Amino acid sequence: MDEAAIEDLFAAFGPVRCKRMFGGIGIYADGLMFGLFAFDQISLKADAEFASLLEGEGSRPFQYEARGRSIKLGYWTLPDSAVDDPDAAADFARQALRIARAAAASKPRKKQKTPKN
């Protein structure tokens, strides 16, 4: 799947921006990454409640192997039923963006460095 196909899939959601990163593609809306495309699958940011819903739809947690360890990032695969259904993909994307916004709001703001005289 290329960037144009990702944008088409989420067209009912609204404009998304794709950014290549780490051999995959980050999927952004409103300046926040809410999804990613890697290893031939789309995954969405999820909290525990959304992960439970996604698991019920047959999704799996996004994970990869690095240095002999399995790494999980808090993303879950887009359900197969939504891969060819832009309206369903949009519904899932809205939930993932809500979670990305909440995560961004809960991060402590960085203090600006004051110049030393």
Regions found by a protein language model. Name each.
Residues 1-117:
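Charge-dense, helix-prone N-terminal extensions
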